[in-house]
Curated annotation (Swiss-Prot):
It is a single-pass type I membrane protein. This is Seizure 6-like protein 2. It is found in: Cell membrane; Endoplasmic reticulum membrane. Keywords: Cell membrane, Disulfide bond, Endoplasmic reticulum, Glycoprotein, Membrane, Repeat, Signal, Sushi, Transmembrane, Transmembrane helix.
């Protein structure tokens, strides 16, 4: 055996970690341990917490010289969170799954394999951990002795350190917000926590007062694919689960969402370090409201306000009774709601109507509370001295199972005046002999739907009853319908009088027993016909009742030659097998424009010419009347081209168009000349159906002045509150004030503009006595000279040259009783010199200047006199006589007229 080889001491790092693993180090929790005090122990000190952080930092700062076990994370700084923080398992990458135990130290013999119970015990995770057992350390390398030497008997201490990654929870950033308005932003991605973990799970709960909802607007949104933002409404109350409003894929910048409750949740998740800019959302509370209550069948509803406190009032049509609360109130709450369920309008099966004036009797709905078998009895009682007229509006009875009887009286024993089993439906109705009518309806499992609508009216015995025309109008010469009154009938578009032609006028006759001289006509939707009006309606036969089988109706629509027809399908609900065909021309031989079957939505069709033919075919078959089956078609003529009709410019105004041609979408803008105002809409739009959105406006001359207004410290009286042309406004001031300006203003008209007042609005100024002019100072003057100066006016003084001003240059009139100047007017005094010698020097200077000048003048005068008087010569040569003899030049011309002109005189001066 060779000599044992000297052993090198372990590195300081290994010794330090070995000491850490010793059991005598107590109270220092490692990374995966909870730093919780044992029962009965004191709270760890600050020093122990700092030491724990120091140890944890030492683990993170291990260098390459510390080997890692297989399966450990190659970068512990990424896999190991700070002390006390956790990471959610679903977001962990596979490389960081738990697979290591606590810090261990193993003593391995030269064989390189763990021997004895010490190795597995040390490599086994402690109880309570989820990490699987670690494999043994790797086999050591070749022997440390010389090559070919014997086996060494010494052992080498190998210290293996592993880093444990524990499954922890994500970072939470929850926030409860109760303000009415604000912003919600994504977490600060620059924080140390976000940089270390990169895992976020944030829930922002926004709640406001009950009765308010929350409106959000996405101002900024920049998320990566791994990030998710959810917007949920509701929650926070028992039985009220949150409802998803939108997620990241549904959101966009500028988008607005509303929560129907007073609570809203924003849930943001990021499985790794966020790379996007995040989000910014603005929120604000808004007042919630109740939904609009549904309109009951055979009734109506009127709403004052949909917000809490508003009411909804329900009404039923004539012949129907309200079932439920008549008035509902919108109650405040998390979700405002009406105080009760909306009522319904039901036709009663029988009853007594007292003091009847005008109303209806309607049969109950089939299959209702009364069941298929009906026995309904109504008693209609009018006031004393009146009788009743009963008009049959709609009657559809099963001949075998239904029966209707009407008695003139108020009991079942009164005489029968109508029996459906024996009599036809009376077109002019029934008139009672007394003040009551007894109506009885019997129905036993009818094969067809029951339809009954009777209109009753009470009238005086000395008058005729008021005539009634369904789907038409009645005009009369006497609204009281006394004897001699005439009633004229006309039908609504789509209907025709039946019987056709006269009489469409009936007369109330016989004063002793007033009655109409003829029956009332009826308005019915006919099967076919020729229509040449610019606009009208085409109805299915017998509309609004269902058409009967076996129909073959043809309608011809004709408009002006330069026009074409726009057909709008409002209602189309025909039975299976029935068909409505539209031909683009005159007659069924024209091109087929459309074929309509079964229920159809609203639509529009245009003909190419001025003619359109409609044919409706319903094959014969067993009767199957159904309510609401048929069609309603509206038509009107439009220009052949795709333009709206030309509109002239308004008188006293003009219009501008957005397009050269009046095509669909063209906008016309109207304006008026000065002095005129626009009556009507100033903007018209060419609509899809080639009609204008409104009637063209007009320019009307403005005949009123604008309100001149009140005055301060005064009042006014007007001749007309509208201020028309010619009206007057008179102004007066309060005591102590005086009027400055015109007291009366008159509104007068102008040809080229709006009416104008005759003068400006006056003012009321404090009443003060004026200041008198103080006078002009001697050797001076003043500006703005006048006799009187009002309070507040100023006066300025000036002096002539050589005088100086003594006193105030400007004085002001101070108001008072009387008003006074601020000071006395100034004086103008001669300017005085203080040195008399300067006056003498001034005189000498004047003498020195004037004396030579006088001498020059005297000398010049003497010279002039000498030459002119004594020598007889002109000093300047301006005299007409000359002292020189003239030089004569002979002319070559013999003409005596020019001889004088040829004599030239020359003067030479030296």
């Amino acid at each position: 055996m060779g000599t044992p080889r000297a052993q090198h001491p372990p590195p300081p790092q290994l010794l330090f970690l070995f000491l850490l693993s010793c059991p005598w180090i107590q109270g220092l929790p490692l990374k995966e341990e909870e730093a919780l005090p044992e029962p009965g122990s004191e709270t760890p000190t600050v020093a122990s917490e700092a030491l724990a952080e120091l140890l944890h930092g030492a683990l993170l700062r291990k260098g390459p010289e510390m080997g890692y076990l297989p399966g450990s994370d190659p970068d512990p700084t990424l896999a190991t969170p700070p002390v006390g923080q956790t990471i959610a398992a679903p977001f962990l990458p596979r490389a960081t799954e738990p697979g290591t135990g606590p810090l261990t130290t193993a003593v391995t013999p030269k064989g390189g394999r763990g021997a004895g119970p010490t190795a597995p015990e040390l490599l086994t995770p402690p109880p309570g951990t989820t990490a699987p057992p670690l494999p043994g350390p790797a086999s050591p390398g070749p022997p440390l002795g010389p090559e070919g030497g014997e086996e060494e008997t010494t052992t080498t201490i190998i210290t293996t350190t592993t880093v444990t990654t524990t499954v922890t929870s994500p970072v939470l950033c929850n926030n409860n917000i109760s303000e009415g308005e604000g912003h919600v932003e994504s977490p600060d991605l620059g924080s140390s926590t976000s940089r270390t973990l990169g895992l976020l799970d944030c829930t922002y709960s926004i709640h406001v007062y009950p009765g308010y909802g929350i409106e959000i607007q996405v101002q900024m949104l920049n998320l990566s694919r791994e990030e998710e933002l959810l917007v949920l409404a509701g929650g926070g109350s028992p039985g009220l689960a949150p409802r998803l409003l939108a997620n990241s894929s549904m959101l966009g910048e500028g988008q607005v969402l509303r929560s129907p409750t007073n609570r809203l949740l924003l849930h943001f998740q990021s499985p790794r370090v966020p790379r996007g800019a995040g989000f910014r959302i603005h929120y604000q509370a808004y007042l919630l409201s109740c939904g609009f209550p549904p309109q009951p069948a055979h009734g109506d509803v009127s709403v004052t306000d949909l917000h809490p406190g508003g009411t909804a009032t329900f009404h039923c049509d004539s012949g129907y009774q309200l079932q439920g609360e008549e008035t509902l109130v919108c109650l405040n709450g998390t979700r405002p709601a009406w105080s009760s369920e909306p009522p319904s309008c039901m036709a009663s099966c029988g009853g007594t109507i007292h003091n009847a004036t005008l109303g209806r009797i309607v049969s109950p709905e089939p299959g209702g509370a009364a069941g298929p078998n009906l026995t309904c009895r109504w008693v209609i009682e009018a006031a004393e001295g009146r009788r009743l007229h009963l008009h049959f509006e709609r009657v559809s009875l099963d001949e075998d199972n239904d029966r209707l009887m009407v008695r003139s009286g108020g009991s079942p024993l009164s005489p029968v005046i109508y029996d459906s089993d024996m009599d036809d439906v009376p077109e002019r109705g029934l008139i009672s002999d007394a003040q009551s009518l007894y109506v009885e309806l019997l129905s036993e499992t009818p094969a067809n739907p029951l339809l009954l609508s009777l209109r009753f009216e009470a009238f005086e015995e000395d008058r005729c009853f008021a005539p009634f025309l369904a789907h038409g109008n009645v005009t009369t010469t006497d609204p009281e319908y006394r004897p001699g009154a005439l009633a004229t009938f006309s039908c609504l578009p789509g209907y025709a009088l039946e019987p056709p032609g006269p009489p469409n006028v009936i007369e109330c006759v016989d004063p002793t027993e007033p009655h109409w001289n003829d029956t009332e006509p009826a308005c019915k939707a006919m099967c076919g016909g020729e229509l040449s009006e610019p606009a009208g309606v085409v109805l299915s036969p017998d509309w609004p009742q269902s058409y009967s089988p076996g129909q073959d109706c043809v309608w011809g629509l004709h408009v002006q030659e330069e026009k074409r027809i726009l057909l709008q399908v409002e209602i189309l609900n025909v039975r299976e097998g029935d068909m409505l065909t539209l031909f683009d021309g005159d007659g069924p031989s024209a091109r087929v424009l459309a074929q309509l079957r079964g229920p159809q939505p609203r639509r529009r069709l245009l003909s190419s010419g001025s003619d359109l033919t409609l044919q409706f075919q319903a094959p014969p078959g067993p009767p199957n009347p159904g309510l609401g089956q048929g069609f309603v078609l509206h038509f009107k003529e439009v220009p052949r081209n795709d333009t709206c009709p030309e509109l002239p410019p308004p008188e006293w105004g003009w219009r501008t168009a957005s397009h050269g041609d009046l095509i669909r979408g063209t906008v016309l803008t109207y304006q008026c000349e000065p002095g005129y105002e626009l009556l009507g809409s100033d903007i018209l739009t060419c609509q899809w159906d080639l009609s204008w959105s409104a009637a063209p406006p007009a320019c009307q001359k403005i005949m009123t002045c604008a309100d001149p207004g009140e005055i301060t410290n005064g009042h006014r009286t007007t001749s007309d509150a509208g201020f028309p042309v010619g009206s007057h406004v008179q102004y007066r001031c309060l005591p102590g004030y005086s009027l400055e300006g015109a007291a009366v203003l008159t509104c007068y008209s102008r040809d080229t503009g709006t009416p104008k007042w005759s003068d400006r609005v006056p003012k009321c100024a404090l009443k003060y006595e004026p200041c008198l002019n103080p006078g002009v100072p001697e050797n001076g003057y003043q500006t703005l000279y006048k006799h009187h100066y009002q309070a507040g006016e100023s006066l300025r003084f000036f002096c002539y040259e050589g005088f100086e001003l003594i006193g105030e240059v400007t004085i002001t009139c101070v108001p008072g009783h009387p008003s006074q100047w601020t000071s006395q007017p100034p004086l103008c005094k001669v300017t005085q010199t203080t040195d008399p010698s300067r006056q003498l020097e001034g005189g000498n200077l004047a003498l020195a200047i004037l004396l030579p000048l006088g001498l020059v003048i005297i000398l010049g005068s003497g010279v002039y006199i000498y030459y002119t008087k004594l020598q007889g010569k002109s000093l300047f040569g301006f005299s007409g006589s000359h002292s020189y003899s003239p030089i004569t030049v002979e002319s070559d011309f013999s003409n005596p007229l020019y001889e004088a002109g040829d004599t030239r005189e020359y003067e030479v001066s030296i």
